[in-house]
Amino acid sequence: MLKGVENHSLPRTAAFFDLDKTVIAKSSTLTFSKSFYQGGLINRRAVLRTAYAQFVFLAGGADHDQMERMRAYLSALCRGWNVQQVKEIVAETLHDLIDPIIYDEAASLIEEHHTAGRDVVIVSTSGAEVVEPIGELLGADRVVATRMVVGDDGCFTGEVEYYAYGPTKAEAIRELAASEGYDLSRCYAYSDSATDVPMLESVGRPHAVNPDRALRREALARGWPILDFHRPVRLKQRIPGFSVPPRPALVAVAAIGAAAATAGLVWYANRRRANVA
């Protein structure tokens, strides 16, 4: 599937991975909804709505307009949430919640890319409080995600500084390539969503993973490889055992509140329910 070990006399390369339904089997942020409830960040009603949103997300996800509306909704809902508390909740529950839903196929690909000498970069609309710990768990070198403003009191102000979605993901990849010396024509990218077409077409070796219908059509039209990941498994249970080689500290290129992304999908669930009614 992959090219051999990198020729280090050539420019560096990287593999860019979307996170939800590409590396892990569920929405990373929605997976923490029960933990956020137990920590007092959301109420019981919101927990039920996030469960519904998880179902909707797995069934097909949100389109561009819905995701744009999520951005406005999440910023309002998360205003005043303590960032350190969110980080602590994620740290306490990360292995129990995320480890079991990592795709075995994705973990193998990450190993192969590292063995070949490529950097691994997680590129996600979800947040630093979720994505950075998952990146460390996987041995990723860098994380690109959305960024919300944090006030002097350590809480979200409700303002979105940077939204890692659609074309902005591709822009971040190009900026990272310029700063790190990646040759994008020889880089890889993986995603499940048609909203990530700009990211996929920014590299020379794009791959559709568990694609939604729109991305499947695009991949077939462009001749992009289509991969089927369907085996979530705990990393420590993989055979041979998954091992993360010693690597420099993960670099967060950008970040967002995990709770904020959860709130966005709560909004999406409400919208879908209203349409059905």
UniProtKB/Swiss-Prot annotation:
**What taxonomic classification does the UniProt entry list for its organism?**
Bacteria, Bacillati, Actinomycetota, Actinomycetes, Kitasatosporales
Positions of Mg(2+) binding: D18, D20, D192
Q: Which CDD domains match?
A: HAD_PGPPase
What molecular function terms (GO) are annotated for this protein?
hydrolase activity; metal ion binding
Q: What is this protein called?
A: Inhibition of morphological differentiation protein
Q: Which UniProt keywords apply?
A: Hydrolase, Magnesium, Metal-binding
Instruction: Provide the family line.
Output: Belongs to the HAD-like hydrolase superfamily. SerB family.
The protein's matches in InterPro entries, at most eight in alphabetical order, are given as: HAD-like_SerB, HAD-like_sf, HAD_hydro_SerB1, HAD_sf
Superkingdom of the source? Bacteria
